[in-house]
Amino acid sequence: MDPARDIVKLAVFERHKGTGHKGVGFLGGYGLKAGAVATSVAHDSHNLIVAGVSDSDMALAAEAVRKAEGGIAVVKGGTLLGILPLPIGGLMTPMTAQAVDEKLEELKRLAAGLGVREGIDPFMTLAFVSLPVIPALRLNTCGLIDVERQEILEVSFGETQFRNEKVGGKLYGSGENISPERK
């Protein structure tokens, strides 16, 4: 991670079957300078996706979303700044439309306060980062995917290297299995 160069850690966790599958990579151009943002709204599989500057804030944001049975959370310095619980499939809430709109606007302001760039929707950006049917690079529970070549890539940054261990899974919408040879 290098927030000074606008590079933060990104992680996607499988949240439906308890498989423990995860993908870890990096996100550039998001603007985050502190804290973490997590959401269970992540197309198409709606797994848990977290972007952050520190592992501890990422873990807290992810845990807040897990405890809420889905949602959107913003964390800074070990403090949960805000959460929109989405307990219906991790995508919906019994709250009124007005209450949801107000909470989303509050969370967007909080994310902007952490450095998310103006003009970027912090939550929809994360929702599409994991969608492995649109070019070019996407991160899902299989790892970093080169969508056009349909390959899992290794991720490294400086001395840190991440090996995404899940192989043999399906790329959503591709109809092809990823084989260990393509890793």
Task: Label every model-predicted segment.
Residues M1-K183:
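Active-site microenvironment of metallo-dependent hydrolases
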